[in-house]
Amino acid sequence: MGQIKDILTTLLPLVVLFLIFYFLIVRPQRQQQKKHKEMIESLTKGDKIVTQGGLIVEVLKAEANFFSVKLNDDTTAKLSKNYVAFKLDELDQFGLAEPIVIQQGREEISAKLSGAKTLKQRQITTE
């Protein structure tokens, strides 16, 4: 009976640490990977995506392991499905698809993440 208690008191902290590790790191990562895979499988012609390299491209055709994408009016390329970062529409959920204007003194730097014309500009003042 005493040996079983010793084994339980030794293993219990390890089991608790494993459970904490699983629920805080492994499980959320698997859920995120599952959502990303579903997003990649749902991409169709005309969807705009952002690559892991930061390029904003439009999907022309989905193939087995690649997407045929349009970089601009004249340039098409093939993109591995492994290098899709996210769908551009996902930014709209967080309000990040609006043009961003950064003011530093007298200089203005504007960046536009999507081509929509009816978006409001955000003012971010840095000092």
Curated annotation (Swiss-Prot):
Return the SMART domains for the record.
YajC
Share what the entry says about its subunit structure, partners included: Part of the SecDF-YidC-YajC translocase complex. The SecDF-YidC-YajC translocase forms a supercomplex with SecYEG, called the holo-translocon (HTL).
Task: Tell me where it mainly resides.
Answer: membrane
Q: Which InterPro entries match?
A: Preprotein_translocase_YajC (IPR003849)
Has keyword Transit peptide?
no
List the protein's name.
Sec translocon accessory complex subunit YajC
The transmembrane residues are 6-26
Pfam family for this entry, one: YajC
**From what organism does this protein derive?**
Helicobacter pylori (strain ATCC 700392 / 26695)
Identify one Gene Ontology CC term for this UniProt entry.
plasma membrane
Q: What does this protein do?
A: The SecYEG-SecDF-YajC-YidC holo-translocon (HTL) protein secretase/insertase is a supercomplex required for protein secretion, insertion of proteins into membranes, and assembly of membrane protein complexes. While the SecYEG complex is essential for assembly of a number of proteins and complexes, the SecDF-YajC-YidC subcomplex facilitates these functions.
Protein's GO biological process: protein transport
- Highest taxon of the lineage: Bacteria
To which protein family does this belong? Belongs to the YajC family.
Keywords in UniProt for this one? Cell inner membrane, Cell membrane, Membrane, Protein transport, Translocation, Transmembrane, Transmembrane helix, Transport
Q: Where does this protein reside within or beyond the cell?
A: Cell inner membrane
Membrane topology for this entry?
Single-pass membrane protein
